[in-house]
From Swiss-Prot:
This is Lysine--tRNA ligase. The lineage of its organism: Bacteria, Pseudomonadati, Pseudomonadota, Alphaproteobacteria, Hyphomicrobiales. It is found in: Cytoplasm. Belongs to the class-II aminoacyl-tRNA synthetase family. Its EC number is 6.1.1.6. The gene is lysS. Mg(2+) 2 binds at residue 415. GO terms for cellular component: cytosol. Keywords: Aminoacyl-tRNA synthetase, ATP-binding, Cytoplasm, Ligase, Magnesium, Metal-binding, Nucleotide-binding, Protein biosynthesis. One of its GO terms (biological process) is lysyl-tRNA aminoacylation. HAMAP family: Lys_tRNA_synth_class2. It comes from the Bacteria. Binds 3 Mg(2+) ions per subunit. GO terms for molecular function: ATP binding; lysine-tRNA ligase activity; magnesium ion binding; tRNA binding.
Amino acid sequence: MTDTKTETTALSSDATEVRRQKLALLREQIGDVYPAHFHRTLSNAELAEKYADIEADVETGDTVTVAGRVYSSRNSGMFMDIHDASGKVQIFSHKDTTPEAARNLLPMIDIGDIIGVTGKVRRTKRGELTINAEEITMLTKSLLPMPEKWHGVSDIELRYRKRHLDILANEDSKLRFLQRSKILSGIRRFMEAEGFLEVETPMLQTVYGGATADPFKTFHNTLKMDMYLRIAPELFLKRTLVSGLSDKVFEINRNFRNEGVSTRHNPEFTMMECYWAYADYEDIMGLVERLFETLAIALHGTTEVEFQGQTISFKGPFKRVPMPDAVKEATGIDFLAIKTDEEARAAAKAAGFAVEKDWTWGECLAFIFEEKVEATLIQPSHVTHFPKDISPFAKEVPGEPRLVERFESYCNAWEVGNAFSELNDPEEQRRRMVEQLEQAHARGEKDKQLDDEFLDAIDQGMPPAGGLGIGVDRLIMLLTNAPSIRDVILFPARRNKAD
């Protein structure tokens, strides 16, 4: 290689242009600046583990090959820190130990470049594990400057738009996404240990259902038909339960809802949904508690988790409270003593709540719960006995036909889980779904259709079952101390830059 010192003095002062000029020089001098393959003998973490016991100011004589991105460079490249996904190692280049060809490459290396290094392992007098460079290989020339390492990417929107920079510069962000992966793996292991079979159901559906939400609509050119990104996998998972493939099934996958964006809502989000034959919602409560406790211990070694300045305990059993009782305690309104929709609306208005003129008894109850009770549910809690009006897939509570065996799990005032004793009476299921369809059409949801294939499956006979859906992103927020859902989704929904 020719000497590059004099050539680099004439480079442009613009940082990006300097890098492009260096790239051009490197192409002339070494040819391929982006080689297809590089063999390293150890990751940086493996290197640190293997040589953890060597003392300061000791040279091992062992030759290793590592690779990583340059995060810092001092004394004209004499000292460089390179990072791979597992950690960092210091690289030392000196005329006494580093051949001229390798030293001549140093002026061409910028922060952010990815290099490979072969050399002898030693520990410095200050105790830093170091490789004395004997060969340096340019693996990737970065054409853009790195974010300032010690301050990271402080612009919140930029962090979401350019997540690669966020993770490159912010150790907290990197750790959070590593934890996300660990949580997802933990959910799978837990469900499999509980005897559940993981299945996959359609993301593209001809009839959307299983939840009340606006779908994303598309068109299949070959089949010449409208299709929808699923809003929930529920109806297909129940059809799987009918099939007898397994008495316990679950799915971890994306749902899509064409609705608002907030710190707790993203149009594309991850759910874990499961169905357990011959179980009811009481069994599912226990399942939720065991799952949350298992994940907290796996991630933090304890059930006590810090979230935004408060301690949340995931130690079961969680508090359980029927919705009518919670509303009565918060407002004094005894919904169980109210007999008609008109009386419910009048009681709500008398207490200062703005309810719609056509709302039912159950809709009034649920609305007041959301307004007055949700915000108080900081520690993990199960809210039970939901109104049947808003729960078309759940069994009635014996002796109280206006309520159903449904619960939602709350934490930090957020709903993180929703579960039923699943309705399996085919005639009652059809009646409720027809009623739900009529209500949707009255709201102007003309695309909403009756899922006849699901109803046919229920006619075949579905065993009694408990069903559960968990908002995985919100659960990850709680377990990783993330204030926004966009902090735990690698590439969250955002407006176009021009907007």
